[in-house]
């Protein structure tokens, strides 16, 4: 069965998922494709494993940016695709292959249907961690090409193809990784009084962390602490000297994030005192909330509703994390959900976005960019 050019690009990218700042094959694929679009008004830069492309407009007054994240996840794929990942233990389970393909399609349209304003395409690495948006934004490579307006999208398995969803203001939460290492004194299981059990300490800590949200955050201001992984000990008859908790924090306000972290630190200090152990807290990667520019978002939604065949709906904010929030903190713009109608959700080994969405997204985004970037 013959597939369209951009569906094939998505499948090519799907086969080569790579984790943050190791997207060398993906970067080269993007560069090779851009090479086929060579024009005197197209400029290309690389930044780490990312790519930045500028299409110089005919009569520019501003720079419009489109950001696509390009990294995959450390997940073993279970889609059954003929074009499944060839990289063991890695998968495009968050749709970044689709995001990148749409970006390349939009770039292709921008070259063949040149507009007045400049366009900059940011093919950004490491969205899944440790975070590529902020360092790319602050890079010398982007300094002269920094957009005046920027947009981004994320696939949404729960919405039908042909539907987009977004809202003015807060869209995605503030997020932070959470790692807590406990160190005590190990020993023989028969002599617990001579040791200091870090599995017991970790168990108490997990239980106490459950009170942080329920008793310290306003019920109208949502927040989440999830401990997703606990490790500790070596064998069944040795008391554990060390244990490690790994999790995530998500809040809808910066103030709540500060409050939650403060309470975590107080509780951990209490565990140290109670169990006479040492504890180290590491917050890992932290992402700023995605806050859509009200006027630009409202204008975009009205345009999509009135001038395209896409269905646009107003959604509620989500506890999802996205480092695109750093870009929106400095540049007016917006992000939206793009429906892909998948039975399985994001970060699932069986995620299968409907590829029909690719051409639809390229078409309506090209319409919007031309409307926004041409003199009226």
From Swiss-Prot:
<feature type="active site">
    <location>
        <position position="69"/>
    </location>
</feature>
<keyword id="KW-0378">Hydrolase</keyword>
<dbReference type="InterPro" id="IPR002933">
    <property type="entry name" value="Peptidase_M20"/>
</dbReference>
<comment type="similarity">
    <text>Belongs to the peptidase M20A family. N-acetyldiaminopimelate deacetylase subfamily.</text>
</comment>
<dbReference type="InterPro" id="IPR023905">
    <property type="entry name" value="AcetylDAP_deacetylase"/>
</dbReference>
<dbReference type="Pfam" id="PF07687">
    <property type="entry name" value="M20_dimer"/>
</dbReference>
<dbReference type="Pfam" id="PF01546">
    <property type="entry name" value="Peptidase_M20"/>
</dbReference>
<protein>
    <recommendedName>
        <fullName>N-acetyldiaminopimelate deacetylase</fullName>
        <ecNumber>3.5.1.47</ecNumber>
    </recommendedName>
</protein>
<feature type="active site" description="Proton acceptor">
    <location>
        <position position="128"/>
    </location>
</feature>
<dbReference type="InterPro" id="IPR036264">
    <property type="entry name" value="Bact_exopeptidase_dim_dom"/>
</dbReference>
<dbReference type="InterPro" id="IPR017439">
    <property type="entry name" value="Amidohydrolase"/>
</dbReference>
<dbReference type="GO" id="GO:0009089">
    <property type="term" value="P:lysine biosynthetic process via diaminopimelate"/>
</dbReference>
<dbReference type="GO" id="GO:0019877">
    <property type="term" value="P:diaminopimelate biosynthetic process"/>
</dbReference>
<comment type="function">
    <text>Catalyzes the conversion of N-acetyl-diaminopimelate to diaminopimelate and acetate.</text>
</comment>
<dbReference type="GO" id="GO:0050118">
    <property type="term" value="F:N-acetyldiaminopimelate deacetylase activity"/>
</dbReference>
<keyword id="KW-0028">Amino-acid biosynthesis</keyword>
<keyword id="KW-0457">Lysine biosynthesis</keyword>
<comment type="pathway">
    <text>Amino-acid biosynthesis; L-lysine biosynthesis via DAP pathway; LL-2,6-diaminopimelate from (S)-tetrahydrodipicolinate (acetylase route): step 3/3.</text>
</comment>
<dbReference type="InterPro" id="IPR011650">
    <property type="entry name" value="Peptidase_M20_dimer"/>
</dbReference>
<keyword id="KW-0220">Diaminopimelate biosynthesis</keyword>
